Amino acid sequence: MFMVQHTLLSDDIAHARFACDISRCKGACCVVGDAGAPVSRSEVAVLKKAYSQLKDRLSAESRDKVIVNGLIQESTDKKLELSCVRSGECVFVQYTDTGVATCAIQDAFYKGEFDWEKPISCHLYPLRIKKLSGLEWINYEYIPSLCSAACDRAEKEGIYLADFLKKPLIRRYGESWYTEFVAACEHIRTMKKEYSNEARNELSSGELTNNKSRVEAEKGVNNTRPST
């Protein structure tokens, strides 16, 4: 675990490679899960505005869900989350002609039709934020069925999670925080690399010592054999 200003972060965030590959995952993070995306109370008004403006683009099932249960629900631990239809997809999901699930809010944002991109919890995924003793604790939520395509792409292209999520992290915490965060990640990676090299050298040195001892022992045995 490491700390950047007022946030705690799990070490795997520094090492993880991640870059969405929506052509493969088909927007799975928008349609799979036991609950809807977490939202803050400060986001409620803009989400209601988005729904009012975009509801005609959404499925009939999504609109029915909102009529019956509301756009935003409260979980058992009193946290707010977006409503989902029975199949698990967010009520704001819409599909492309190729079957990719996309966010209606984000789509409208990119087209210049809405002035807000999407909930910060969606923007930051696969990072999840929890409150811990007055601090924010950020974890990397790796779910193979959702994240494997993104991890495969990132490994091939050499993209770190910390770099891929630059925009939402700055949106959440600001430029100065992000600069410190990147520096901390680079330091952690360097330390791990140096430790790995040291461990490898020690292992090689140990193997050489063992081999030398074994050779000397064999010589000793040969020298003490009785002549015939």
Predicted regions located by residue number:
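Short loop/turn segments that flank or connect secondary-structure elements
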Residues: 1-228
